[in-house]
Amino acid sequence: MPWIGLDDTDTLSGGCTTYEFHLLITELSRLSDLGSPWGLPQDTRLVRLWPFASKRTRGNAALALKIDVLEGHENSLLDFLEGWYASLKKRISELEVVQSNHSERLQHSPEPCLLYLNKQFPDFYWKAVRGHVTLEDAKKTVLEDPLSKIWSDEKKMSGLIGSLAAISWKGDGDCTWELTAYRRIENYLTKRRISNESVKMMSNKYNKTLLNRDPNSKKPLISPNTPCPVLYGIRAENDIDALNAHDYLQSFDENEICNSHQIWRTNQATGDHIEKRYRGVLNSNPIILKGGHIYLEISGISDGVNEEILMAFEESGNIKQLANDLKKGDTIEWMGLRCPTGEIHLERLKLVKATIGNRKRPMCVCGVRFESSGKNQPLRCKCGKTFPRLWVGEKRDSSEWKEPSSGNRRHLSKPLNRI
């Protein structure tokens, strides 16, 4: 059964790949109902990719769907997609490229790609969600399907990577769902109207929804702050709860009424971008950097790597607090993502075995502290008494896993309550 994928249609000033794909889904469905030789779109999905990709889009998400075409009528679908892509190019050519005031990442003009395939390439998805892949990698993979079709600018087609990855994601190990609600055109330039209280009530009523509010600030997390058509996105463990939660929000008079909505199967909150957890020992006490970030030097790592540098950012909350309290010699476990400069950005941290705090030699009954008398020798006091070699001090307990708050985590990060 054929697949259609799309990526890279937005900038910080506007545009929205999910909305463009929603329009495509809507039109494919309308034409199917009118007798066009294809079925209704299936398995509509939103797939997040490697967070450090150099030309990643605003949310670094790509879209795909599966569609059944009557045998011998594939060209009818391809002709439709040709025309749709031409209209898409015209729309996004009017977008302005502005630079971010909260990120040093250079913004680029959109490099949209619409992709038609007859097969999936799961290995490519795993490469694209966990690390850097080149455009040449994507082109080479697509050529393995002789029936593939690419619509893109030959010299500007970075969207091919996301389109191919979205199609290639299986999601059979884990997945979540998102309902994205879109605004009415007349509301685009106005402030989004979704009451905090309604989001709180929705979260309590539908406990299979995910990451709706920041537990610390109590602020809703479902609405973006960018000038895009999205009103809000509700994430959930299943599509039914996402839809019911949406209907519930729309029932509040004070909330903005949406124009339309789309349900996606997603890899959000699955942790797909991180392969495994690691264990190691701190070489030195934590180093506090400018901005309150914590720098950890680790050795004795479980997979045989000699040393690693871990970064706990100020915004990571509980992770940063635990990192700050660590001591040289502590054994920790962590999960995180290696950035292009080599450091690992922590997404989860756990103290496994703590060293003794304020470590000292024990006191002799005479009131003087024992001292070492040499390697592998018992401790000795000036009064002549000896004592087994040991340290005394403050016992520090191990910890449970720590993670950032809901408002300071990556789209892909898997919350502890999903494990």
Where do the model's predicted regions map?
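N-terminal ordered "arm"
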Residues: P2-R48
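OB-fold (S1/OB) nucleic-acid-binding surfaces
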Residues: N285-S316
